[in-house]
Amino acid sequence: MWVQPALDPDLGLIYANTGNPWPDYNGSTRGGDNLFTSSIVALDAMTGKYRWHFQSVHHDLWDLDMPTPVILFDQVYAGQMRKALAAHSKQGWVYILDRVTGKPLIATEEKPVPQEARQKTAATQPVPAGDPTAPQCAEPVAQYERGCMFTPVWTDTKIAQPSAAGDWAPGAYDPQSGYLFFTTGVSTRKFSPTGRVSVPGTREYGLITALDSRTNKQVWQKEVPYLAGFGSGVLATGGGLVFHGGSDGYFRAFDSKTGEELWRFQTGFGADAPAATWETGGEQYVAIAAGGSRDGLKEAKGDLVWAFKLGGKLNPLNGPPAPPTVVTTAAPPGTGVDRPRD
């Protein structure tokens, strides 16, 4: 189990995300779908008894499990109010399921994918309708074979995006608009059965995306100069704002309907923690911890918790060094090391 499960107390179910199979990138010794890896599994909260599962990647060869928490919400599909679950995957897809049965509420098709007999690849993979939150093919790089989602690897010259940096941070849901919000990291990695390594000269960046939960279609998307799939994630408030903390130290607020940046505050360090909001004394507060926790991103380290309200008086700090946006050093072949930099 990757992260803390979600709980529906009315249904008496918990929803757990499971990790990918091992070895991560070599499927030659583990044929079949490898259940229940890279899946969402629903269990009876009182007994632990299995209720249903949905596998997002069959026979995972790319470390594309889902380390971000699922989101539980209610929404109308086909004219009926349904108890839904949204799961954002590292490949930049959002699976919207009926959390009672595990069946997709947004059409999901088992599509044929490229094959590699030595890797014992699955014949198909589940692909949801709608828009992905990340590019599905690598940007071209000289001397490398360009790969797309579910390109199998056996040689060490194939590259792919968004790679396993896709999404680790929590998403959010706004019941007023019906929008889902997610962060994504986009990086280029060279894959082989022994691991994935950085590709020098390629850029790394992040995306913040709003999707309409009724259609799984993109409403807006913003690019940021760091791997936004790690760290803070997003917080949606009833006032129509989406908050996000970045590796560049900024705590930002966006208009939830348009994506327009309305406010930013420099915390002085990598603002990686999920934001929190609460009300006390009739006033709403929003808080975030700024500690620069991601060693691989070479963030400025700190030890601060910032709390904000309307009319607050504190001044921002000086910004930390900007996180690198271009990979400068490749990891040693076969190590699987993901993000070394000069």
Q: Language-model features: where?
A:
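Noncatalytic, solvent-exposed loop/strand surfaces
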Residues: 1-341
